[in-house]
Amino acid sequence: MTESQETPITEDGEARPHRRIKSFVMRAGRMTEGQQRGLEQGGPLFILPLADSPVDYDQVFGRSAPRTLEIGFGMGHSLLEMAAAAPELDFIGVEVHRPGVGALLNGVLTQGLKNLRVYDCDAIEVLNRCVADNSLDRLMLFFPDPWHKARHHKRRIVQPEFAELVRRKLKVGGVFHMATDWEPYAEHMLEVMKVAPGYRNQAADGAYVPRPEERPITKFERRGERLGHGVWDLKFEKVD
């Protein structure tokens, strides 16, 4: 995700603040009863407000535990599965699409999970305003919008500025884990991360890692595998 490179000027000659190019488009969607239940009953319990200063997540969760943040969890199936499988870890999910937030929260309520919280706003704002530097053990970005057309590549969230923002938020030893089913985007991710300072690629061959066991396989991924489509996982560890 990048900022515009040109500073707009107002009619009176004053510089207008940059308007950041966003990596997502808000889409309207109909809610199921379960999604609506998740928002109405789970929202007050599990949706966190956008803060103006770093949040004390130990206080939010009532404990100190390794912390994972996922950007763009979609309908929440993978995040829900990971949180249920690892109650000793704390998870924060960020998603702007309300049906997905509702679906995740409905699952949280149904399973009685205590180790998951949600932001329903722009992930860049969450990282900049709510997450303290050197505080995350893992940041996950699974199947972000690849923005296929060349003129839209500037909207891809994985850009040098984003890699640096993630690095600041990770602890030393923390991992930035990305996955995509679009090979040109995987190549773009690798190009960005290979030259991003302060990271080490965990892949033995300096490219992609085998699918980690902790990342659940989605139904779309299974369908893609049947059709012969690939999935590329990248893991970069913060070393500085």
Curated annotation (Swiss-Prot):
UniProt: S-adenosyl-L-methionine binding residues: E70, E95, D122, D145
Keyword set includes Transferase: yes
Q: Which GO terms describe its molecular function?
A: tRNA (guanine(46)-N7)-methyltransferase activity
Q: What class of enzyme is it?
A: transferase
| Pathway membership | tRNA modification; N(7)-methylguanine-tRNA biosynthesis
Q: Which Pfam families match?
A: Methyltransf_4 (PF02390)
Cross-referenced CDD domains: AdoMet_MTases
EC no.?
2.1.1.33
The UniProt entry, under InterPro entries, shows: SAM-dependent_MTases_sf, tRNA_(Gua-N-7)_MeTrfase_Trmb, tRNA_methyltr_TrmB_bact
Origin superkingdom: Bacteria
Q: Which residues form the active site?
A: D145
Query: What are the entry keywords?
Result: Methyltransferase, S-adenosyl-L-methionine, Transferase, tRNA processing
Q: Which residues bind substrate?
A: K149, D181, T218, K219, F220, E221
List cellular component terms (GO): tRNA methyltransferase complex
Which reactions fall under this protein's catalytic activity?
Answer: guanosine(46) in tRNA + S-adenosyl-L-methionine = N(7)-methylguanosine(46) in tRNA + S-adenosyl-L-homocysteine
Q: Any idea what job this protein has? A: Catalyzes the formation of N(7)-methylguanine at position 46 (m7G46) in tRNA.
PANTHER family hit by this protein: 3-DEOXY-D-MANNO-OCTULOSONIC-ACID TRANSFERASE/TRNA GUANINE-N 7 - -METHYLTRANSFERASE, PENTACOTRIPEPTIDE-REPEAT REGION OF PRORP DOMAIN-CONTAINING PROTEIN
Q: Which family does it belong to?
A: Belongs to the class I-like SAM-binding methyltransferase superfamily. TrmB family.
**What name appears for this protein in its UniProt entry?**
tRNA (guanine-N(7)-)-methyltransferase
**What is the source species?**
Pseudomonas entomophila (strain L48)
